[in-house]
């Protein structure tokens, strides 16, 4: 957060260049130093603004697109509200967190450093109940087979 604090004064001080110009010796050296970071920070602000936006978009990963695609496959004529979409997104994040935690436990129990499809499959069987687990395992196996064959 300190770099942001440095950028804000650098952005404010070029606007105050006229009063700084009156202070010739003291103002010139800091001006030169301020101009270089201001130029750099202006370049970085533009770059970071773009990068920051990209990072912002990357950090906000949602499953909304995929939920919508599945909804349209199952019920093409039905829509979904933004609140319902948010609930579905939270539900998927929660399930994936539970599956990842269970897979990590299984890998630790077996003293293996890698989570493989086997750990994921076992964690699905442990986390999801009965028939839902069977369907999830069959769909997952089908997806992995399709992925490896192509």
From Swiss-Prot:
<feature type="modified residue" description="N6-acetyllysine">
    <location>
        <position position="34"/>
    </location>
</feature>
<keyword id="KW-0007">Acetylation</keyword>
<dbReference type="InterPro" id="IPR055333">
    <property type="entry name" value="HISTONE_H2B_site"/>
</dbReference>
<protein>
    <recommendedName>
        <fullName>Histone H2B.2</fullName>
    </recommendedName>
</protein>
<dbReference type="GO" id="GO:0046982">
    <property type="term" value="F:protein heterodimerization activity"/>
</dbReference>
<dbReference type="InterPro" id="IPR009072">
    <property type="entry name" value="Histone-fold"/>
</dbReference>
<keyword id="KW-0832">Ubl conjugation</keyword>
<keyword id="KW-0158">Chromosome</keyword>
<dbReference type="InterPro" id="IPR007125">
    <property type="entry name" value="Histone_H2A/H2B/H3"/>
</dbReference>
<keyword id="KW-0539">Nucleus</keyword>
<comment type="function">
    <text>Core component of nucleosome. Nucleosomes wrap and compact DNA into chromatin, limiting DNA accessibility to the cellular machineries which require DNA as a template. Histones thereby play a central role in transcription regulation, DNA repair, DNA replication and chromosomal stability. DNA accessibility is regulated via a complex set of post-translational modifications of histones, also called histone code, and nucleosome remodeling.</text>
</comment>
<dbReference type="GO" id="GO:0030527">
    <property type="term" value="F:structural constituent of chromatin"/>
</dbReference>
<dbReference type="GO" id="GO:0000786">
    <property type="term" value="C:nucleosome"/>
</dbReference>
<comment type="similarity">
    <text>Belongs to the histone H2B family.</text>
</comment>
<keyword id="KW-0544">Nucleosome core</keyword>
<dbReference type="GO" id="GO:0003677">
    <property type="term" value="F:DNA binding"/>
</dbReference>
<dbReference type="GO" id="GO:0005634">
    <property type="term" value="C:nucleus"/>
</dbReference>
<feature type="cross-link" description="Glycyl lysine isopeptide (Lys-Gly) (interchain with G-Cter in ubiquitin)">
    <location>
        <position position="146"/>
    </location>
</feature>
<dbReference type="InterPro" id="IPR000558">
    <property type="entry name" value="Histone_H2B"/>
</dbReference>
<comment type="subunit">
    <text>The nucleosome is a histone octamer containing two molecules each of H2A, H2B, H3 and H4 assembled in one H3-H4 heterotetramer and two H2A-H2B heterodimers. The octamer wraps approximately 147 bp of DNA.</text>
</comment>
<feature type="modified residue" description="N6-acetyllysine">
    <location>
        <position position="7"/>
    </location>
</feature>
<feature type="region of interest" description="Disordered">
    <location>
        <begin position="1"/>
        <end position="57"/>
    </location>
</feature>
<keyword id="KW-0238">DNA-binding</keyword>
<keyword id="KW-1017">Isopeptide bond</keyword>
<dbReference type="Pfam" id="PF00125">
    <property type="entry name" value="Histone"/>
</dbReference>
<feature type="compositionally biased region" description="Basic and acidic residues">
    <location>
        <begin position="1"/>
        <end position="16"/>
    </location>
</feature>
